[in-house]
C-alpha cells in the first residue's frame, strides 16, 4: 500500500526525476526537479496557480516514484529519455518521434553519391535539410539523377581500382561509370560540385552554363542535345524554386513560436538553412489550458529535439523557461554549441512574429475543421444508437473482413473507428493459420477468437501490473462490432463472444446485387436505412475501409509469394543474381523486357545465366 503522506515527507532535497502513476500503475507524467522535495510536494498543495491540466492530473495520481541524479542536467536528460519511453498522458507529446529526412552527399567517398538519410553523423559527408516532406526529398534526388550523371550504386568504388563492367545506367546515359574507371575522380567531383551548388541555392550559375551549352548545341544543329539541355534547365529551376532566400546570412536556424486559445495550443517551427526556409511543421497540443507560454515552449523543445535528428546552431523563441539548462542539454546532444535566443526587434523578431501568425491561423483552421467533423460524427453515432436501440453511443467500432483467392493466403483484417473517425494505429491484421482452403466462416472464427483471447490476456496482465494499459494492443473492447457479411458472419461472431462470456452488439453490413452497401442486419432483421443519409455514408465508409485493408494485406502476401516463385524457378539464378537483377531492373516486368546485352551488363551475370533468363521468359 502506497503511503502518500509518508512518501511526501521523505522526499530528498536533491535533483532528480519523478514519475506519477495512476491506479493501474501506468505512468501518466514524468518531470524533472532541481530539488525533488520542493517540486513534488507542490502538486499536492492546494493552490490557485495550478492549471486545469495539473488539477486533472493530480486527481489521477495514485502513487509516485523518483530517481535521484547527480545534477540538474542529468535529470533533464533522464526526463527526456523516460518521456520518450513511456509516452505519459499528461506530458506534452508530439504525435511521432520525427527524424526529418536530409539529402546527403557522401563526400568521404572517391566518387560521391546523393542519397536520402534521417541520421546526421560526422562522417565527412555534406548534409542538406531537414526537409519536412519526405516525398520532396525523393523528388529532388530523382531530379538530380536525371540531370547529373552520378552513380546510384552502393559499391565501394576507388580511383585506380580494378575496373568492372558498367551497369545499365551507363548505357542509358545516367552514369559516367566510375566503376569501370571511365571518369577521373577530379572530373567526377566537378559534377558533384554542381550538385552541391544546386542544393545550396546557387543554381543560377549552373543554369547560365547550361544555357550557353544549349545555344552552342543549337548553333551546331545538335537539336536533340539542345532539347536535353533545355529539359535539364527546367529541372534545375524547379529544384531552385523549392527554396526561397529570406535572410542574407548563412546560418542554420530554427524559429519556434506558439499560439494558445485558452484551451489548446499550436506550435509552429520554421526551418532556415543557409538563409532559406527549407520547411515548416506544426503541432497541435490539446488541453494545455492556462499553462504559461514559457513552460509550454520549454516542454516542447525537450520533446521536439529529444527526437529529431538535427539540432541547429541557433533556436529563436519568444520566451522560455530553463534557458541555460536547455542550452546545455542541446549542446550535449549536438556535440557542438547550440544557442537559444529571444529576439526583441529586427528581422529575427519579424520572422518569429510570422511564425506566431502561422500558428494562430493553423489552430483556428484546425478548430473549425474539428468542430465541423465532431458535429457530423456526433450526429452519426447518435443516429446509429437510435437505429439499433443501443444503450450507449458506439464510441469504438470494430469491423472485420476476410480476403482470399481460391483459398490461398487467407487473411483477416480488423479496422477501428473511434468517435466516428478511422483510427489506423489500432488496425490489426491476421494471417489465417488453422483453416485449409476457402472457408470464410472458419477463418472469421479464428481471427475473432484470437482478437478476444489476446484482449482478455492483456486485461489480466494489466490487472496484475505486468503490462501498462497504454501498451495493450487488444485490451480495449469495442462498443459495436460490424461484420462484412450477413447472418452467417453475425452468428460466428456471437458464438465467439458467447465462448468468452463477452456481451457486445454485432451487426452485419450487407450489400445489394451490384455490390453496393445496402444496410445493416441486427438481431436477425434487416434494418432499413436512408441510402442518402449520414449513417449510410458512414457504414459504406467502414465497409470499404475494412475491405481495402484486407485486400492490401492479401496483395502484399500474394506479391511476396509470386515474386519468390518466379525468380527462384529460373535456372542458374541464385540469391546474389536475383538481388542484382531486382536492384538494377526494379521489377519482374523490366527483367522480362531486358535484352541479352542488358542482362550481361549486370556484374554478377554471365552468358549462361543471361540465356536462362531469356529462355524462362520467352
Swiss-Prot record:
Superkingdom field: Bacteria
GO molecular function: DNA binding; excinuclease ABC activity
SMART domains: GIYc
Span of domain GIY-YIG: 13-92
UniProt xrefs under PROSITE patterns: GIY_YIG (PS50164), UVR (PS50151), UVRC (PS50165)
Principal localisation: cytoplasm
Keyword set, alphabetical order: Cytoplasm, DNA damage, DNA excision, DNA repair, Excision nuclease, SOS response
Pfam families (UniProt xref): GIY-YIG, HHH_2, UVR, UvrC_RNaseH, UvrC_RNaseH_dom
Record-linked InterPro entries: DisA/LigA_HHH, GIY-YIG_endonuc, GIY-YIG_endonuc_sf, GIY-YIG_UvrC_Cho, RuvA_2-like, UVR_dom, UVR_dom_sf, UvrABC_protein_C
GO CC term, one of those recorded: excinuclease repair complex
GO process annotations (BP): nucleotide-excision repair; SOS response
Residue ranges constituting the UVR domain according to the UniProt record: 204-239
Keyword Cell membrane included in the entry's annotation: no
Keyword Cytoplasm: yes
Subcellular location(s) of the protein: Cytoplasm
Family statement drawn from the similarity comment of this UniProt entry: Belongs to the UvrC family.
Complex and partners: Interacts with UvrB in an incision complex.
PANTHER family per UniProt: UVRABC SYSTEM PROTEIN C, UVRC/OXIDOREDUCTASE
Function: The UvrABC repair system catalyzes the recognition and processing of DNA lesions. UvrC both incises the 5' and 3' sides of the lesion. The N-terminal half is responsible for the 3' incision and the C-terminal half is responsible for the 5' incision.
NCBIfam families: PRK00558.1-5, uvrC
Annotated protein name in UniProt: UvrABC system protein C
Taxonomy of the source species: Bacteria, Bacillati, Bacillota, Clostridia, Eubacteriales
Amino acid at each position: 500500500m502506497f503511503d502518500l503522506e509518508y512518501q511526501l515527507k521523505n522526499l530528498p532535497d536533491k535533483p532528480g526525476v519523478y514519475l506519477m502513476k495512476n491506479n493501474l500503475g501506468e505512468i501518466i507524467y514524468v518531470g524533472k526537479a532541481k530539488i525533488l522535495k520542493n517540486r513534488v510536494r507542490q502538486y499536492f498543495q492546494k493552490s490557485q496557480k495550478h492549471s486545469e491540466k495539473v488539477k486533472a492530473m493530480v486527481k489521477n495520481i495514485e502513487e509516485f516514484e523518483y530517481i535521484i541524479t547527480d545534477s540538474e542536467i542529468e535529470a533533464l536528460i533522464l526526463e527526456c529519455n523516460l518521456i520518450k519511453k513511456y509516452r505519459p498522458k499528461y506530458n506534452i507529446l508530439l504525435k511521432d518521434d520525427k527524424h526529418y529526412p536530409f539529402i546527403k552527399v557522401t563526400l568521404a567517398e572517391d566518387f560521391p553519391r546523393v542519397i536520402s538519410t534521417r541520421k546526421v553523423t560526422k562522417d565527412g559527408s555534406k548534409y542538406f535539410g531537414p526537409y519536412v516532406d519526405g516525398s520532396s526529398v525523393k523528388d529532388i534526388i530523382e531530379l538530380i539523377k536525371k540531370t547529373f550523371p552520378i552513380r546510384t550504386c552502393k559499391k565501394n568504388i576507388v580511383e585506380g581500382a580494378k575496373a568492372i563492367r558498367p551497369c545499365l545506367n551507363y548505357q542509358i546515359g545516367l552514369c559516367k561509370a566510375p566503376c569501370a574507371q571511365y571518369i577521373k575522380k577530379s572530373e567526377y567531383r566537378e559534377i558533384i560540385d554542381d550538385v552541391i551548388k544546386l542544393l545550396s541555392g546557387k543554381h543560377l550559375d549552373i543554369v547560365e552554363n547550361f544555357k550557353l551549352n544549349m545555344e552552342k548545341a543549337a548553333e551546331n544543329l545538335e537539336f536533340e542535345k539542345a532539347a536535353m539541355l533545355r529539359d535539364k534547365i527546367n529541372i534545375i529551376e524547379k529544384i531552385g524554386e523549392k527554396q526561397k532566400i529570406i535572410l542574407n546570412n548563412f546560418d542554420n536556424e530554427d524559429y519556434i513560436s506558439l499560439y494558445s486559445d485558452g484551451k489548446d495550443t499550436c506550435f509552429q517551427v520554421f526551418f532556415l538553412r543557409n538563409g532559406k526556409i527549407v520547411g515548416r511543421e506544426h503541432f497541435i497540443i490539446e488541453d494545455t489550458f492556462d499553462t504559461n507560454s514559457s513552460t509550454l515552449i520549454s516542454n516542447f523543445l525537450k520533446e521536439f529535439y529529444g527526437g529529431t535528428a538535427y539540432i541547429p546552431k541557433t533556436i529563436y523563441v519568444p520566451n522560455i523557461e530553463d534557458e541555460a539548462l536547455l542550452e546545455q542539454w542541446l549542446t550535449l546532444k549536438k556535440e557542438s554549441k547550440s544557442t537559444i535566443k529571444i529576439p526583441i526587434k529586427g528581422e529575427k523578431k519579424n520572422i518569429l512574429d510570422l511564425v506566431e501568425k502561422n500558428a494562430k491561423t493553423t489552430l483556428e483552421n484546425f478548430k473549425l475543421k474539428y468542430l465541423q467533423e465532431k458535429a457530423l460524427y456526433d450526429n452519426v453515432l447518435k443516429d446509429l444508437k437510435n437505429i439499433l436501440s443501443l444503450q450507449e453511443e458506439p464510441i469504438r467500432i470494430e469491423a472485420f473482413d476476410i480476403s482470399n483467392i481460391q483459398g490461398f493466403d487467407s487473411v483477416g483484417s480488423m479496422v477501428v473507428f473511434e468517435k466516428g473517425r478511422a483510427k489506423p494505429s489500432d488496425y490489426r491484421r491476421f494471417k489465417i493459420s488453422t483453416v485449409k482452403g476457402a472457408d470464410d466462416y472458419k477463418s472469421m472464427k479464428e481471427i475473432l477468437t484470437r482478437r478476444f483471447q489476446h484482449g482478455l490476456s492483456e486485461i489480466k496482465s494489466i490487472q496484475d501490473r505486468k503490462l501498462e494499459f497504454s501498451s495493450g494492443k487488444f485490451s480495449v473492447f469495442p462498443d459495436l462490432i460490424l461484420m462484412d457479411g450477413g447472418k452467417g458472419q453475425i452468428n460466428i461472431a456471437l458464438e465467439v463472444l458467447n465462448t468468452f462470456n463477452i456481451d457486445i452488439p454485432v451487426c452485419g453490413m450487407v450489400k445489394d446485387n451490384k455490390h453496393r452497401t445496402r444496410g445493416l442486419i441486427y438481431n436477425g432483421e434487416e434494418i432499413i436505412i436512408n441510402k442518402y443519409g449520414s449513417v449510410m455514408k458512414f457504414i459504406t465508409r467502414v465497409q470499404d475501409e475494412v475491405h481495402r485493408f484486407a485486400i492490401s494485406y492479401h496483395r502484399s502476401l500474394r506479391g511476396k509469394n509470386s515474386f519468390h516463385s518466379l525468380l527462384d524457378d529460373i535456372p542458374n539464378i541464385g540469391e546474389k543474381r536475383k538481388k542484382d537483377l531486382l536492384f538494377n531492373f526494379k521489377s519482374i516486368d523490366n527483367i522480362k523486357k531486358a535484352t541479352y546485352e542488358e542482362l550481361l551488363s549486370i556484374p554478377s551475370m554471365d552468358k549462361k545465366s543471361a540465356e536462362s533468363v531469356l529462355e524462362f521468359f520467352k
